[in-house]
Each structure stands twice: as structure tokens, then as C-alpha cells.
């Protein structure tokens, strides 16, 4: 049976095995999908061992997306643009194809599942790590009026601005730099919610915002979404839909078929609430 896994640290919280099990049943594929904990200093070693034991492909999550980019021997165009990789497909001659499905997963969830049109909108993206860099190009391809990147370390946000400056109207800086501006959509791409923490976003930035989105998923509102709700935002969405949509893109890369996602999103929400009760 073909073996796949999601690799990260921490990893026990991951719902990727649940999602890919649903996809396999839906499409009639025989596959084993599990979690793989890698030491913070042992990503490449863990990947090599997994492959030597017959692994076919991997999903990569926090904090290894930049290391995965460096380890891949071939890259898809979207992974090359992102400088970050969240999917490996192992190929012949020890080749590793690296892809990044985060951006298309996010955009599909926002534009299709949530029916939120991005053209002309002002978007604030919080964070400048692997999760953020993976979604910038797909967001810009939707032609927003502005994509602003805010980060605790502004130099990293400015570096991303310079990396993607030819793809659309993009700017970068510290959170405080955007006080007084109004955004239609605010996206949290930091890992703060993973640690039950709140990014340093000024309350002022939520004024007039139509949709607030946390790329991490939870059985209840994340601290970021809870904070947004106290500022009067009512359209609050976590990353459950994005997780399923990006997983479907990985499944497509591995198996040549894109599974249906709507039912799986509903099943995953039920699963999250079941384990929270």
C-alpha cells in the first residue's frame, strides 16, 4: 500500500490523515497516510528515512516549509515563487518534486466556499513566514486593490514585498505602519493561534473589515478570531476549508485526480467539534 504522511513539529494535532482518508475512500484509492514528527534539527534525516522505507509523498507543515524548499530537487512554478514548499512527491533518480498548495487552497476557500470576491479589495496579510509566502502570489493573481503584509519584524515583510513587487500592488511593514488604513479582508498567517497566543495587531485595523480569516483551524474560535469579534467583526472564518482545499491539490499532484471537498469540509468540522466535546 502506498504510504504518505504529513511532517512537522508539533504534529499530533494534524487533521491531514483524516482528510486524506476521506479522499481515498471517495476516489477508491488504497493508501496509508500518517503523521511524522521530525526533530527541529532533523528534517532532512526524517524525510530520507521515510523515503527509504517506501514513502511516496509528504505534506510539510510548521516549521519546515523553507527547509523543504531547499531540499526539493525540482519545483513547481508556484513553489518557486513562494520560496516555500508544503508538498513533496518522490520521483525516480532520487528526485523530489516540491509544490506549494497553500495559496490555491486559501484562494479557493475564500472565493468559492465563502463567495468572497477579491478583485479590488484591500487585504492585510499578517506574518512573513512560510505560510504567508506561500499564499502571496495566488492572492495577487486575484487582483486585489492592495495586499499589505504586516509582521513583527518589518524587514521580513518588506523582503516579501520586494520579492513579489512585479505581481501586483503590494506593500510591507510593521503592524503599526498600517494604523488608520481600512481593510476588507484580514488574514492571519502567523503561527500565534497554534500557541494559543495573539499576534500584535492593533484593534484599530479591524474597523470596517468585512471578513477576518485565520489560516489555522480549531474546534472553537482562535484567540485571533475572538479578538476580532470583540472589535465588531461578525464574519469570522478559520482555516478548516483552506486545509481541505490545499490537501485536495496535494492529492491531485500525487494521484492525478482532484477530490470533491465540500463534504469533507463538513466532515472535518464535525470531527473537530466531536473531539472538542
Curated annotation (Swiss-Prot):
Pathway: Metabolic intermediate biosynthesis; chorismate biosynthesis; chorismate from D-erythrose 4-phosphate and phosphoenolpyruvate: step 4/7. It is an enzyme of class 1 (oxidoreductase). It catalyses: shikimate + NADP(+) = 3-dehydroshikimate + NADPH + H(+). Its EC number is 1.1.1.25. CDD domains: NAD_bind_Shikimate_DH. GO terms for cellular component: cytosol. Keywords: Amino-acid biosynthesis, Aromatic amino acid biosynthesis, NADP, Oxidoreductase. Homodimer. This is Shikimate dehydrogenase (NADP(+)).
Amino acid at each position: 500500500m502506498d504510504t504518505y504522511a504529513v511532517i512537522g513539529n508539533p504534529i499530533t494535532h494534524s487533521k491531514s490523515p483524516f482528510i486524506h482518508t476521506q479522499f481515498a475512500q471517495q476516489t477508491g484509492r488504497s493508501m496509508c497516510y500518517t503523521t511524522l514528527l521530525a526533530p527541529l534539527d532533523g528534517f532532512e534525516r526524517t524525510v530520507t528515512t521515510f523515503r527509504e522505507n517506501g514513502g511516496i509523498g509528504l505534506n510539510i507543515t510548521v516549521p519546515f516549509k523553507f527547509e523543504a524548499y531547499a531540499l526539493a530537487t525540482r519545483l513547481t512554478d508556484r513553489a518557486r515563487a513562494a520560496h516555500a514548499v508544503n508538498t513533496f512527491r518522490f520521483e525516480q533518480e532520487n528526485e523530489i518534486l516540491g509544490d506549494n498548495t497553500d495559496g490555491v487552497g486559501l484562494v479557493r476557500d475564500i472565493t468559492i466556499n465563502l463567495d468572497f470576491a477579491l478583485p479590488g479589495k484591500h487585504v492585510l496579510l499578517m506574518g512573513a513566514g512560510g505560510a504567508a509566502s506561500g499564499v502571496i502570489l495566488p492572492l495577487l493573481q486575484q487582483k486585489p486593490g492592495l495586499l499589505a503584509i504586516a509582521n513583527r519584524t518589518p524587514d521580513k515583510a518588506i523582503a516579501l514585498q520586494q520579492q513579489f513587487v512585479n505581481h501586483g500592488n503590494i506593500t510591507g511593514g510593521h503592524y503599526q505602519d498600517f494604523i488608520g488604513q481600512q481593510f476588507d479582508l484580514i488574514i492571519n498567517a502567523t503561527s500565534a493561534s497554534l500557541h494559543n497566543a495573539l499576534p500584535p495587531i492593533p484593534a484599530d485595523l479591524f474597523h470596517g473589515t468585512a471578513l477576518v480569516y485565520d489560516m489555522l483551524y480549531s474546534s472553537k474560535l482562535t484567540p485571533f478570531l475572538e479578538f476580532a469579534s470583540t472589535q465588531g467583526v461578525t464574519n469570522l472564518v478559520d482555516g478548516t476549508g483552506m486545509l481541505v482545499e490545499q490537501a485536495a491539490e496535494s492529492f491531485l499532484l500525487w494521484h492525478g485526480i482532484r477530490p470533491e471537498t465540500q463534504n469533507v469540509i463538513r466532515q472535518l468540522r464535525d470531527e473537530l467539534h466531536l473531539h472538542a466535546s
